[in-house]
């Protein structure tokens, strides 16, 4: 399990930002100013849509100028492309199709919606050195971690930078 204070496991996943495909390495994204990892089961479930659209509407850069948000699910890039187009998601959605990254963060369901290994809804706020500053993992499928503590954790990154 990856807890607060731990160094987050590095990874590299294919992803999509808008219609631009690329490969995203966590260490590269974090080095630019911290990262929010937002794990979620799938693009088109109603709760995931609500969660990702809520994240879309947050002004992340007012907290931390070079902050990155990365959405991670087991959906394909094709599903991500459709979802991004329908909901104007401005941050990259990454495809963890084999569940390797989900398992390395220990945020997978055993079974959900008759599918093994889908990601739970989870947030990890990482600083520039990939240290986990905040972690929230939903225990129930209908639970969405609270945004208030998440925003506080992101704000605290700018305090760490000024020390």
Please give the residue ranges for each predicted region:
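Chalcogenol-based redox active-site neighborhoods
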Residues: 1-163
């Amino acid at each position: 399990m990856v807890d607060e204070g731990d160094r987050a496991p590095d990874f590299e996943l294919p992803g999509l930002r808008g219609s631009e495909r690329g490969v995203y390495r966590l260490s590269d994204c974090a080095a630019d100013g911290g990262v929010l990892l937002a794990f979620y089961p799938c693009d088109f479930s109603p709760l995931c849509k609500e969660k990702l659209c809520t994240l879309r509407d947050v002004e992340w850069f007012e907290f931390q100028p070079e902050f990155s948000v990365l959405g991670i699910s087991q959906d394909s890039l094709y599903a991500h492309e459709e979802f991004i187009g329908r909901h104007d998601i401005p941050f990259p959605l990454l495809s963890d199709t084999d569940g390797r990254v989900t398992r390395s963060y220990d945020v997978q369901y055993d079974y959900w919606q008759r599918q093994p290994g889908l990601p739970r809804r989870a947030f990890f706020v990482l600083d520039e050195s990939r240290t986990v500053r905040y972690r929230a993992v939903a225990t129930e499928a209908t639970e969405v971690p609270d945004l208030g503590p998440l925003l506080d954790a992101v704000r605290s990154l700018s305090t760490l930078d000024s020390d």
